[in-house]
C-alpha cells in the first residue's frame, strides 16, 4: 500500500503589521484558497479595530474562518483552536480548495501543524483539589502566580481566570516534573500536513514605524470607542481583554494613565510583541523567510508555494 497523501496547507506567519493579510488574500485568489485565521484574538466578536481584524472589503469574497466565533466574555484554549482548525482544513480540502493559515500566534499555529496531544488524564486529584481550594480562598491570581514561578511560558499563554487550565498546567508540573510548555515542544517532530511555511520580515526600524502608524490609524478609526463599548458592558478580567490594544486602553478608563500614556504604551507593547513573534518563529519553526522591506514579493512567494506543494495557480499557463 502506498503512503497516505497528506493534505496540503500553506501557512503565512510573521510579526504584526508586516503585511500578512494582503498577501494571504492575493495568494488565496491565485491558488484557489480559503483562509483560516491563525490569530488568537481575531476570534472575538466586536473586537475589530484593536485586533486589526480583516474587513469584509479586504476579504474580497475569499472565505475566512476562525474570525468572530466567540464573545469577549468567553475563554479560548489552544486545544479548541487545534480541533476547530483541523476540521476546517479537512473541509476546505474536501471542497478542492487550498487551506491557507495566516496569523502571528505561533503556538496556536504550531499546535495545528504538528502532532500535539492535549490530554486531560486523571493526574493527581488530591493536588488538583488543593489548588482549586487555594484559588477559592486566595484568588485566581495567587494560583496563576504559582504557575508563573514554575512555567512562565504557559502562564503567559493561559489567562489567570482560566482556572481549570492554570491548575492543569500546575498539575502536570507537579506530577511529571516537566512544564506543560516543554511537553508540547517534545511533540513538535511530526508534521501532519504537506506544509509550505512562509514568513514575512522587514527592516526592524521600518516595521516599528509601521506599527506606530497602525496604532495612530486604529485610534482614528475608533479604537477608543470600541474599547469603551467593552468596558461599559462590564467586561473585566477576561482572556480577550489581555490583548494588546485593549489592556492599555482599559488602564485609561480605570484612571491609571492618561490617554496619551495609554497610546504610547500600546505602541511600545506592540513593538515588543513583534520582536517576540520574530524570535519565537525563528527558534521554533522551520520557516522560509521573505524580506518585504523593499516591497511585496507576492509573485516570488506564489512561485515558491507552487513548487513546494506541487500546485498550479490561476496565474499559471
UniProtKB/Swiss-Prot annotation:
Single annotated GO MF: ATP binding
Region annotation (Interaction with substrate tRNA) ranges: 39-42
Keywords: ATP-binding, Magnesium, Nucleotide-binding, Transferase, tRNA processing
Chain ranges passing through the membrane: none
Pfam families from the UniProt entry: IPPT
Cofactor dependence: Mg(2+)
Class of this enzyme: transferase
Site positions (Interaction with substrate tRNA): 105, 128
Gene Ontology terms describing biological process: tRNA modification
Residues the entry annotates as binding ATP: 14-21
Catalytically driven reaction(s): adenosine(37) in tRNA + dimethylallyl diphosphate = N(6)-dimethylallyladenosine(37) in tRNA + diphosphate
Entries under Gene3D superfamilies matching the protein: 1.10.20.140, P-loop containing nucleotide triphosphate hydrolases
Intrachain disulfide bonds: none
Enzyme Commission code(s) on record: 2.5.1.75
Keyword Signal: no
Keyword hit for Transmembrane helix: no
Binding site for substrate: 16-21
HAMAP family linked to this entry: IPP_trans
Family, per entry: Belongs to the IPP transferase family.
Task performed by this protein: Catalyzes the transfer of a dimethylallyl group onto the adenine at position 37 in tRNAs that read codons beginning with uridine, leading to the formation of N6-(dimethylallyl)adenosine (i(6)A).
Quaternary structure note: Monomer.
Protein name: tRNA dimethylallyltransferase
Upper lineage: Bacteria, Bacillati, Bacillota, Bacilli, Bacillales
Gene name of this polypeptide: miaA
